[in-house]
């Protein structure tokens, strides 16, 4: 019987558990795995931006600009920006009635 389905009932003015097989090793292992899964899920939801950014980009923060003249850095920035700029002519205007 799972720990999640145990029923607590008053026994002699105390709260007890009507579960005889709670010492089963499989139940203990399943409970530990469930608790670890819950902890990892909570951490994932709290830090998902940091975690997935680390997987996507690793430890690098972009190309190194050490020893590169400022004019070449600016040219590189302009090329990068022009690569992501969107031409307005590619959009289709849809008019709803």
Curated annotation (Swiss-Prot):
The record marks 37 as: Essential for channel activity, possibly by being protonated during channel activation, and by forming the channel gate and the selective filter. GO terms for molecular function: monoatomic ion channel activity; proton transmembrane transporter activity. GO terms for biological process: protein complex oligomerization; symbiont genome entry into host cell via pore formation in plasma membrane; symbiont-mediated suppression of host autophagy. The M2 protein from most influenza A strains is inhibited by amantadine and rimantadine, resulting in viral uncoating incapacity. Emergence of amantadine-resistant variants is usually rapid. The record marks 41 as: Seems to be involved in pH gating. Keywords: Disulfide bond, Glycoprotein, Host cell membrane, Host membrane, Host-virus interaction, Hydrogen ion transport, Inhibition of host autophagy by virus, Ion channel, Ion transport, Lipoprotein, Membrane, Palmitate, Phosphoprotein, Signal-anchor, Transmembrane, Transmembrane helix, Transport, Viral ion channel, Virion. Signal peptide: none annotated. Glycans are attached at residue 20. Forms a proton-selective ion channel that is necessary for the efficient release of the viral genome during virus entry. After attaching to the cell surface, the virion enters the cell by endocytosis. Acidification of the endosome triggers M2 ion channel activity. This is Matrix protein 2. It comes from Influenza A virus (strain A/Swine/Iowa/17672/1988 H1N1).
